Each structure stands twice: as C-alpha cells, then as structure tokens.
C-alpha cells in the first residue's frame, strides 16, 4: 500500500444519504482566498464570506471527508450544505455555539 492510497469498490459511493441539505450562495468579500474544510460548521466560517448564516446554522459542506472548498477573492458560488448528524453538538470553530445545536436553532 502506498501512503494516502485508497482501496474502494467500483461504482458510485453515496454520501450523506437521507440527511437534510440546503444550498447557499457564498461570496468572498476578502482580499485573500478562503478555504473551508468538509466538517467545519459553515455558519462560523470566516466573516469575509458573505451568505445567509442563519440558514447555514447546523450545517457543513456536503463534500467528502478530508476535502475542502476554496473561495477566491471576489468569487461568488452556490454550495450544498448537509446537516450535522450524531449528537449534533458543535465545539470550537469560532466559539459561537459551544454545545448542542438544538439550543441554538431557535
């Protein structure tokens, strides 16, 4: 095996089947590229990214684990988000939630 190599079965792999999703339009108003990882609580990303943060609360990018999306300065694009699952508790990031999402979902 080569470090970083994947051994997967042939065919398509379905990600996040059955989970709630939403789409948001995001625009980078900053002067530098901003990269957002697959499991970052999207409502807490860099403030230079402008979008409906309330809609994004409790969601992350709907992309494969360990990958990221890069937003270049001035770039505007639509992304798909997927709801956090499991215990639905968020800690860290920018410290805006620090606990169960349902308490903050009002």
Curated annotation (Swiss-Prot):
User: Is Cytoplasm a UniProt keyword of this protein?
Assistant: yes
Coarse class of the primary localization is cytoplasm
Tell me where it resides.
Cytoplasm
The cross-references to Gene3D superfamilies, in alphabetical order and at most eight, read:
Urease, beta subunit
Covalent S-S links between cysteines = none
Keywords, A to Z, come to: Cytoplasm, Hydrolase
What is this enzyme's EC? 3.5.1.5
Q: Which HAMAP family match?
A: Urease_beta
In Swiss-Prot or TrEMBL terms, this protein is called: Urease subunit beta
Annotated organism of origin:
Klebsiella aerogenes
Q: Which gene is transcribed and translated to give this protein?
A: ureB
């Amino acid at each position: 095996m080569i470090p970083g190599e994947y051994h997967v079965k042939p065919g398509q792999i379905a990600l996040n089947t059955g989970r709630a999703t939403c789409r948001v339009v995001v625009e980078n108003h900053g002067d530098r590229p901003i990269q957002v990882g697959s499991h970052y609580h999207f409502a807490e990303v860099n403030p230079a990214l402008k979008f409906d943060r309330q809609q994004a609360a409790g969601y992350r990018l709907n992309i494969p684990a360990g990958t990221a999306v890069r937003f270049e300065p001035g770039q505007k694009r639509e992304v798909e988000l997927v709801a956090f699952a499991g215990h639905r508790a968020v800690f860290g990031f920018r410290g805006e939630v620090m606990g169960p999402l349902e308490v903050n979902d009002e």
